[in-house]
Amino acid sequence: MEDEEGIGLILARATELRLKISDCIDNSSTTVSDNGDGNEDLSPGEGRKSEIIGNQDKDFDSISSEDVDEAEAERLLRIRDALEALESQLASLQNLRQRQQYEKQLALSEIDYSRKMLLEKLKEYKGKDFEVLRETTTFAGERVDYENDLLLPPYPVHPPLSLGLDNNNGYLSHLPSKKKSDANGFGSGHVRNEAEAKSPNGGSGGSSHGVIRFLGSVAKIVLPIIGVISLLSASGYGPEMRKRGASLNLFGLLPHRATRGKRTPNQCPPGKVLVIEDGEARCLVKERVEIPFDSVVAKRDVTYGYG
């Protein structure tokens, strides 16, 4: 339909241009006739005199204005003839497309009628049940797509030829795809069911494959985190993080130690001393004495003075 509309627009434009050129030709011919009749109002003597003067001017000028107008009108006529030829070709193309569309619709209606008649004959059959009859019923019961330029019964549209390499001989495979419509009984589900029937451990293999994928994804996430923690521990940030009570268990993914030494009630962490006040034990930080570096330490050390 879009092509027909485009052809119609082009045809209308060509007709419009042809009419405009025809108007130009008429105007030029009118101008020539006016120039020729300009001396009718003069007297016979004056007309004779003007005719003599005109002949003299024509002798001096090789091409008069009348000749120029005639040549221009002739060129316009040629252009109009070319436009008329183009217009006729466009009209023929439009008629051809309309005729093809009509014939296509007529053929599709006849195909649909024949398909319905086939279904009626299949329903009237009461004999032995054959597999080919079921396939024919399925084939005739498919929907006809009128927007896909089908000129035949609704056969499935084949995909393009496969350009992949054949696994056996290494050459390009020129065979079409084996996929067909499920309505004909040869769909992908049918092939898959046959493969599952042939393989005895189809279900368990799929589940084990899923578990392996899950474990692989978990390992990809955990291993980089373990590497970062190892680098932090090696650089000295590990004890500081443990002092602050940061949990590095990673949601239970890292293994716990089997046995951990329990801290005794009277034991304090490094850097603190046990002090008993009023019968209550406390861990306090050791006292630090600030001593100027210049008077005591010859070489400055940032770790000097730690308990």
Curated annotation (Swiss-Prot):
Tissue specificity comment: Mostly expressed in young leaves.
Segments in the Cytoplasmic topological domain: 1-213
Coiled-coil boundaries: 76-103
Segments crossing the lipid bilayer: 214-234
Span list, region ARC6 binding: 235-307
Taxonomy, superkingdom: Eukaryota
Reported consequences of knocking out the gene: Reduced number of constricted and large chloroplasts. Attenuated PDV2-induced ARC6 dimerization in the chloroplast intermembrane space leading to an abnormal morphology of ARC6 rings thus compromizing plastidial division. Altered localization of ARC5/DRP5B in cytosol only rather than at the constriction sites of enlarged chloroplasts. In pd116, reduced number of dumbbell-shaped and large chloroplasts in mesophyll cells, with sometimes unique giant chloroplasts.
Gene Ontology cellular component terms for the protein in this record: chloroplast outer membrane; mitochondrion; plastid
Induction data: Slightly induced by gibberellic acid (GA).
Protein localization: Plastid, Chloroplast outer membrane
Modified residues (N-acetylmethionine): M1
Function: Component of the plastid division machinery consisting in a binary fission accomplished by the simultaneous constriction of the FtsZ ring on the stromal side of the inner envelope membrane, and the ARC5/DRP5B ring on the cytosolic side of the outer envelope membrane. Positive factor of chloroplast division required, with a dosage effect, to mediate the recruitment and dimerization of ARC5/DRP5B at the midplastid constriction site in the cytoplasm at plastid outer envelope membranes (OEMs). Prevents ARC5/DRP5B GTPase acrivity.
Subunit details: Interacts (via C-terminus) with ARC6 (via C-terminus) in the chloroplast intermembrane space; this interaction induces ARC6 homodimerization and leads to the formation of a heterotetramer containing two ARC6 and two PDV2 subunits. Interacts with ARC5/DRP5B.
Protein name per the record: Plastid division protein PDV2
Species for this entry: Arabidopsis thaliana
Taxonomy of the source species: Eukaryota, Viridiplantae, Streptophyta, Embryophyta, Tracheophyta
